[in-house]
C-alpha cells in the first residue's frame, strides 16, 4: 500500500477545513473605510462598525485603512483600525479562529458570540472565556506597543474586533 496517498488526503482535508486566512493583500494600499462601509476581501465581507471608547461612549467617527507597515506581524497588507470595529462575516459556525494584531495605544473592543468586551489591551484576556470560547493571547509588550496573536477555540458564531490604534492581519478561521 502506498503510504503517501493517505497522508496527502489528510493534508488536503486539513487545508480545506482550516479555510483561507484573510491577509488583506487583495485590497488597494491606503484605501480608507468609514463606519458603515463594507470591505470585500478574500471572498468574505468585513463590516466597519462603530467603536466603544474606554469610558463607554460609542463613536461613529473613526475609520479603517489598508496599511503595509507590518505592525501586526503578517506579510503584505493589513487593516488598521482607528476607532472602529471590524465585524467579520465568515462561514459560521467555526471551531477556531486566530489572528495577528498590534496595539499601539488606546483600548480594544472584541465580541465573540454576542459577548462584548471593552478592554485596555488584549493581554488581560489570556486564559479567559468570551462567549463560551476559550481565549489564548501570545504577545510581546514593549514601551510603545503590544504585538502578538490571539487564538479563539470553541464554537464561534460571530466575531468582531477593533481598537483605537490597532492593526490586524492573517485572520484564520477553522470550521
Where are these regions (language model features)?
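Bacterial N-terminal signal peptides that target proteins for export
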Residues: 1-9
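Intrinsic low-complexity, intrinsically disordered segments enriched in polar/basic residues
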Residues: 3, 20-21
Amino acid at each position: 500500500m502506498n503510504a503517501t496517498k493517505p497522508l496527502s488526503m489528510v493534508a488536503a482535508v486539513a487545508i480545506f477545513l482550516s479555510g483561507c486566512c484573510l491577509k488583506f493583500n487583495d485590497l488597494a494600499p491606503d484605501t480608507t473605510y468609514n463606519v458603515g462601509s463594507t470591505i470585500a476581501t478574500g471572498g468574505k465581507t468585513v463590516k466597519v462598525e462603530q467603536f466603544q471608547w474606554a469610558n463607554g461612549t460609542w463613536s461613529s467617527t473613526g475609520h479603517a485603512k489598508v496599511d503595509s507597515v507590518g505592525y501586526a506581524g503578517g506579510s503584505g497588507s493589513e487593516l488598521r483600525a482607528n476607532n472602529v470595529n471590524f465585524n467579520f462575516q465568515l462561514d459560521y459556525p467555526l471551531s477556531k479562529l486566530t489572528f495577528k494584531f498590534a496595539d499601539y495605544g488606546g483600548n480594544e473592543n472584541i465580541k465573540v458570540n454576542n459577548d462584548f468586551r471593552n478592554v485596555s489591551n488584549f493581554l488581560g484576556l489570556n486564559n479567559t472565556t468570551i462567549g463560551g470560547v476559550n481565549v489564548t493571547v501570545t504577545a510581546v509588550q514593549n514601551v510603545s506597543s503590544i504585538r502578538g496573536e490571539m487564538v479563539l477555540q470553541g464554537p464561534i458564531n460571530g466575531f468582531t474586533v477593533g481598537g483605537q490604534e490597532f492593526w490586524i492581519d492573517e485572520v484564520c478561521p477553522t470550521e
